[in-house]
Regions:
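Structural motif
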Residues: 21, 27-38
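A short, amphipathic beta-strand motif
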Residues: 25-31, 58-60, 95
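Short, acidic, small-residue-rich periplasmic hinge/interaction motif at the N-terminus
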Residues: 30-33, 41-46, 72-78, 88-137, ...
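Short, acidic Ser/Thr/Gly-rich low-complexity loop/linker segments typical of extracellular
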Residues: 48-59
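Membrane-embedded beta-strand positions in outer-membrane beta-barrel channels/transporters
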Residues: 94, 106, 146, 164, ...
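Periplasmic N-terminal accessory/gating domains of Gram-negative outer-membrane beta-barrel systems
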Residues: 110-212, 229-230
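Transmembrane beta-barrel wall of Gram-negative outer-membrane proteins
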Residues: 243-268, 284-321
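Outer-membrane beta-barrel translocator domains and adjoining extracellular loop/strand segments
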Residues: 275-281, 315-318, 323-330
């Protein structure tokens, strides 16, 4: 009899250990068309409140007990995806979402519910993607990220046609600007008319107007965290544009398919060349040359060793060229 009780107790203890075992589901969420990681994608279990969001590298992780689950992944602008799985051990689940176009018949604007700005954890954070910035009306054909930020609440320009911003009354030198975690000290071209950020190379922008994370310091007003695109990991791609005063070209290519990629994006103004050519063709001395032009280049190489380790090298090079000659006047 005692032996039966001991055996029963052992079986109950073993069953509790088996059914109480916890395992981890983790992986990356990517764009199915080009392999770009999706930041802030929602990953949760269907029919429950258990879930998480992807971090700045598109990575997510969920710790669950063993059993059957339906994992749901959603992201704005992409089709919803559901995956059924049986969890019996640590599992790697990489998810690819297909972009989706949604046509809206009308737009309804409503006020936020009462006290929503108090209970929200991110009430001082604004997020913009390159697609959103592209939709904003541009100056002389040039999409400008800083000009877009100036349209947000609590942000204003520091001067007419200036790429500097003042956040909640602070000075332009009180803003911390980061490009792939590297500090940008001078963010303007052409005397402040244009910013140094080429939107074709930017993935997303986060503006912290308050409640700045503790790992960032040295500024009083705001944090502007800019992330560059990783590049297309599936196929070679390119895009470009011609504006009134400048042209730009972006090239993306996989180094190793679905493992590594590289992106190059450059632009240059040519108003100086156009005016010089017009002066030469017309033969008139009344046309004054434009003594200013700028060019810049963004580059990034990215390689993923495995789901937990990746390395990237990003860089920016820009130059403003100003030349002016003073002729002699005979009196």
């Amino acid at each position: 009899m005692v032996r039966s009780y001991v055996l029963l107790f052992f079986l109950l203890f073993l069953a509790t250990g088996i059914f109480g075992q916890e395992y981890t589901i983790s992986g990356h969420v990517r764009d199915q068309s080009n392999g770009e990681v999706l930041i802030g994608a929602n990953v949760y279990l269907k029919g429950t409140t258990t879930g998480t969001t992807t971090n700045a590298y598109g990575f997510y992780s969920l710790t669950l007990t063993s059993g059957k689950y339906t994992v749901v992944c959603t992201y704005v602008g992409y089709s919803r995806k559901e995956i059924d799985l049986r969890l019996a051990g640590d599992t790697t689940l990489d998810i690819e979402l297909m972009p989706k176009t949604t046509e809206l018949e009308e737009v309804v604007v409503e006020g936020e519910k009462r006290n929503s700005n108090i209970v929200s954890m991110d009430m001082s954070l604004d997020k913009l993607t390159s697609e959103t910035i592209d939709k904003i009306p541009v100056l002389m054909g040039e999409v400008d990220m800083i000009k877009t930020l100036q349209l947000l609440p609590g942000v204003k320009s520091t001067g007419t046609l200036s790429s500097g911003i003042s956040v909640r009354g602070g000075g332009r030198d009180q803003n911390l600007m980061l490009l792939d975690e590297a500090t940008v000290y001078n963010a303007s071209h052409l005397g402040g008319i244009f910013s140094v950020f080429n939107n074709d190379a930017i993935k997303n922008v986060e503006l912290y107007k308050g409640k700045i994370p503790a790992r960032y310091g040295g500024r009083l007003s705001s944090l502007i965290d800019i992330r560059m695109k990783d590049g297309n990991m599936k196929e070679f791609a390119g895009e470009g544009g011609i504006g009134l005063i400048s042209s730009r070209l972006t090239l993306e290519s996989p180094i190793v398919k679905n493992k590594g990629s590289v992106i190059l994006s450059g632009r240059r103004t040519y108003m100086d060349g156009v005016i010089k050519m017009a002066k030469k063709v017309s033969g008139s001395d009344r046309i004054n040359e434009f003594p200013f032009h700028f060019y810049d280049l963004n580059a990034k190489a990215n390689y993923r060793f495995n789901r937990n380790n990746r390395v990237y090298l990003s860089g920016y090079f820009g130059r403003d060229v100003f030349s002016y000659s003073i002729g002699q006047t005979n009196n």
